[in-house]
Amino acid sequence: MELKRVNQDFYVAGQITANDIVKIADQGIKTLICNRPDGEGADQPNVIEIEEAAQRHGLNVIYQPVISGKISDQQVTEFKQLYQNAQKPVLAYCRSGMR
């Protein structure tokens, strides 16, 4: 797992696992935003698994699934609102970290 810093309060990453949560928490991340729909890939953990691990380490999880290449203006607006209201720093993740 590689965290890419966008600014002081926002990071992106490819798919994370429950085992990554300790490292993420140690980096000071407070909120995870999952942009990957559950079931998109056979090898991905679902958001519930990530959320359970995150809660054990005091992290918040927001689930905003979007389909790669089909992100709507409404979803962009929703993401902006979720980010603005989230406890920071925020890590948004999907399969590649590019959504």
Language model feature labels by segment:
Residues 1-90:
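Cys-dependent protein tyrosine phosphatase-like superfamily
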Residues 90-99:
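A phosphate-binding catalytic loop at a beta-strand-loop-alpha-helix junction
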